[in-house]
Swiss-Prot record:
Modification(s) after translation: Polyubiquitinated. Ubiquitination by AMFR and deubiquitination by USP13 may regulate the interaction between the BAG6/BAT complex and SGTA and therefore may regulate client proteins fate.
Region annotated Required and sufficient for interaction with BAG6, chain positions: 96-138
One GO term describing the cellular component: cytosol
Gene field: UBL4A
Functional summary from the UniProt entry: As part of a cytosolic protein quality control complex, the BAG6/BAT3 complex, maintains misfolded and hydrophobic patches-containing proteins in a soluble state and participates in their proper delivery to the endoplasmic reticulum or alternatively can promote their sorting to the proteasome where they undergo degradation. The BAG6/BAT3 complex is involved in the post-translational delivery of tail-anchored/type II transmembrane proteins to the endoplasmic reticulum membrane.
PTM sites of type Phosphoserine: 90
Localization in the cell: Cytoplasm, Cytosol; Nucleus
Keywords: Cytoplasm, Isopeptide bond, Nucleus, Phosphoprotein, Transport, Ubl conjugation
UniProt xrefs under InterPro entries: Ubiquitin-like_dom, Ubiquitin-like_domsf, Ubiquitin_CS, Ubiquitin_dom, Ubl4_C_TUGS, UBL4A-like, Ubl_UBL4A-like
Protein name: Ubiquitin-like protein 4A
CDD domains (alphabetical): Ubl_UBL4A_like
Originating species: Pongo abelii
Subunit structure: Component of the BAG6/BAT3 complex, at least composed of BAG6, UBL4A and GET4/TRC35. Interacts with BAG6; the interaction is direct and required for UBL4A protein stability. Interacts with USP13; may be indirect via BAG6.
Zinc as UniProt keyword: no
Length: 157
């Protein structure tokens, strides 16, 4: 089937692919045609991001469909890859192990793992956004909890 892939900058290409082609293979073809590295590509169909491991047919993409290509900045890709590598390299903290045990009682191993990923990403994102001022405030609250309590009582009057 014939597909059109259009980048936001206006470049586009037409590709001939089977309906059951993997998204990852399509990205490779787009890389060759538009000279955009695979790891910087994000393909969208009707506003939905396409996952590398899925097939075009999984998204009901048919002949003459138009896909949008978002090119991620290289810096963002490197940061994402670095964060993923850091998470993979570090042993899970005890809290994640405990949460994992609780989830394992209620979900299959695969589902429990997927459920756990989101809070871990949120936690990592929150930590990476802490400023020095935020850290100083937290440290002050831990080291001098009585001052924080006094201030809170003063505000509640």
């Amino acid at each position: 089937m014939q597909l059109t892939v259009k980048a936001l900058q206006g470049r586009e290409c037409s590709l001939q692919v089977p309906e059951d082609e993997l998204v990852s293979t399509l990205k490779q073809l787009v890389s060759e045609k538009l000279n955009v590295p695979v790891r910087q590509q994000r393909l969208l169909f009707k506003g939905k991001a396409l996952a590398d491991g899925k097939r075009l047919s999984d998204y009901s993409i048919g002949p003459n469909s138009k896909l949008n290509l978002v090119v991620k900045p290289l810096e963002k890709v490197l940061l994402e890859e670095g964060e993923a590598q850091r998470l993979a390299d570090s042993p899970p903290p005890q809290v994640w192990q405990l949460i994992s045990k609780v989830l394992a009682r209620h979900f299959s191993a695969a589902d429990a793992s997927r459920v756990l990923e989101q809070p871990q990403r949120d936690y990592e994102r929150s930590l990476s956004r802490l400023t020095l001022d935020d850290i100083e405030r937290l440290a002050s609250r831990f080291l001098h909890p009585e001052v924080t309590e006094t201030m809170e009582k003063g505000f509640s009057k």
